[in-house]
């Protein structure tokens, strides 16, 4: 475990932010740097079949050390960090034996406060790794990477019985492209776990059904002084569209299993406006109903417009709830829960109010629930991870490998 923190700090020092709207995968050069570093480390550890695809998926195998027909299992994390907050020049702070209260994030006014983040009350006495208030930390998902790498080392050094262990590190998860170029056949695992979750004990096998909605509004601009009966204000139409979207079904008003509509971007002029929504729901029927609702709104607002003015709506599904695929293989969750209990952790099955590579992989034939990393407050300057949580994640990964080997 002594190298766990060292690995993590090494990985977060690299800027691996992904970038939306880029055709190439990985979308940024920084991701390649981390992938090449990990490839070198895996080879130094003696793993076999170490491959790095042209689309930036790194795979490797820790060969079984016991005979028998043991199913090959996998562990997966992503190398990119969120585009939502800078990942350049990350300067982690290590707070040992946290005693409560506010934690100053670097030099300035930014603090990590238990008033805003009550989970801190549960972490007294632990070692917290925070940001300096200027960037995100990158625990999402470099904590997962460090934990997988450390677990591999533990399995080797302690000669713990295990079958074939596949590992993979993927790019561009944060922009929804992480699993699109994942070769499930080449990975050759019966099932896998993404290590991309949050607090200790979290085990996730349900996620949102997700879609994006892009709306193009074409109006007609003339001088405001002579506009009566002629001007069609695209911005006004955009405002009318958003006014029709249920205000109490937005991200800031929902939790748990509740779905939402989220206006993620809007820009425009009188002549042309563009809106970008994301739609999320755990229930497939409700998900489809939300998409229909957006089409109905666009049709209603666009009714009676001049033929040269129009509203164009394009809906694209992003991913689906992996629950329907994972529940077909209950032993995958049983093993993970037993591993946690064996490590004195009470499993907490909860839905992911988001998505992971595992969601897409589950529909590609690789059932893939999500394990905790020990991290919190992802995608922003209040992100942090506990060293103890990371150590627990390593223990659970190792125990899953051990329990799987006992299922001969």
UniProtKB/Swiss-Prot annotation:
Gene Ontology molecular function: metallopeptidase activity; tripeptide aminopeptidase activity; zinc ion binding
Q: Which residues form the active site?
A: 80, 173
Q: Does the keyword Transmembrane apply?
A: no
Reported cofactor(s): Zn(2+)
Protein's GO biological process? peptide catabolic process; proteolysis
Instruction: Supply the EC number(s).
Output: 3.4.11.4
Question: What Gene Ontology cellular component terms go with this record?
Answer: cytosol
**Group of enzyme by EC:** hydrolase
**What does the cofactor field's note say?**
Binds 2 Zn(2+) ions per subunit.
The catalytic activity, as recorded, is: Release of the N-terminal residue from a tripeptide
Cite the binding residues for Zn(2+) 1: 78, 140, 196
Xref: Pfam families: M20_dimer, Peptidase_M20
List positions binding Zn(2+) 2. 140, 174, 379
The protein's matches in InterPro entries, at most eight in alphabetical order, are given as: ArgE/DapE_CS, Bact_exopeptidase_dim_dom, Peptidase_M20, Peptidase_M20_dimer, Peptidase_M20B
Where does this one sit in the cell?
Cytoplasm
Coiled-coil annotated residue ranges, if any: none
Q: Which domain of life is it from?
A: Bacteria
| Keyword list, A-Z | Aminopeptidase, Cytoplasm, Hydrolase, Metal-binding, Metalloprotease, Protease, Zinc
Record keywords: Mitochondrion included? no
Listed PROSITE patterns: ARGE_DAPE_CPG2_1, ARGE_DAPE_CPG2_2
Q: Which family does it belong to?
A: Belongs to the peptidase M20B family.
What does the UniProt function comment say about this protein?
Answer: Cleaves the N-terminal amino acid of tripeptides.
Provide the protein name.
Peptidase T
Q: Which organism is it from?
A: Shigella boydii serotype 18 (strain CDC 3083-94 / BS512)
What is the gene called?
pepT
């Amino acid at each position: 475990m002594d190298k766990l923190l060292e690995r993590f700090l090494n990985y977060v020092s690299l800027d691996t932010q992904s970038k939306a709207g880029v055709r190439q995968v990985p979308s940024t050069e920084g991701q390649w740097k981390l992938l090449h570093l990990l490839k070198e480390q895996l080879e130094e550890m003696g793993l076999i079949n170490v491959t790095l695809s042209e689309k930036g998926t790194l795979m490797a195998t820790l060969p079984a050390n016991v005979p028998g027909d043991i199913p090959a299992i996998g562990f997966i994390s992503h190398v990119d960090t969120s585009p939502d907050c800078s990942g350049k020049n990350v300067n982690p702070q290590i707070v040992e034996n946290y005693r409560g209260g506010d934690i100053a994030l670097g030099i300035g006014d930014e603090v990590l406060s238990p008033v805003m983040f009550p989970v801190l009350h549960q972490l007294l006495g632990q070692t917290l790794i925070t940001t300096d208030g200027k960037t995100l930390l990158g625990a999402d998902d470099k904590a997962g990477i460090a934990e997988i790498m450390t677990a591999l080392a533990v399995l080797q050094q302690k000669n713990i019985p295990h079958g074939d262990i596949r590992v993979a590190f993927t790019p561009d998860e944060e922009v929804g492209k992480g699993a699109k170029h994942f070769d499930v056949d080449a990975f050759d695992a019966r099932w896998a776990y993404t290590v991309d979750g949050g607090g200790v004990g979290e085990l996730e096998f349900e996620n949102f059904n997700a879609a994006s909605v892009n709306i193009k509004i074409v109006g007609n601009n003339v001088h405001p002084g002579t506009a009566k009966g002629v001007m069609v204000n695209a911005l006004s139409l955009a405002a009318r569209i958003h006014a029709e979207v249920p205000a109490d079904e937005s991200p800031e008003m929902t939790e748990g299993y509740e779905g939402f509509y989220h206006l993620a971007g809007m820009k425009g002029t009188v002549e042309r406006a563009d809106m970008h929504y994301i739609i999320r729901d755990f229930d497939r029927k409700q998900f489809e109903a939300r998409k229909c609702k957006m089409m109905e709104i666009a049709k209603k607002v666009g009714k009676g417009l001049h033929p040269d003015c129009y509203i164009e709506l394009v809906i694209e599904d992003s991913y689906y709830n992996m629950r329907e695929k994972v529940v077909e293989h209950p032993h995958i969750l049983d093993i993970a829960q037993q591993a946690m209990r064996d490590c004195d952790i009470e499993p907490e099955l909860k839905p992911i109010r988001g998505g992971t590579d595992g969601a897409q992989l589950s529909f590609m034939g690789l059932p893939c629930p999500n394990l905790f990393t020990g991290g919190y407050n992802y995608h922003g300057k209040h992100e942090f991870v506990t060293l103890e949580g990371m150590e627990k994640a390593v223990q659970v990964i190792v125990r899953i490998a051990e329990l799987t080997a006992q299922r001969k």
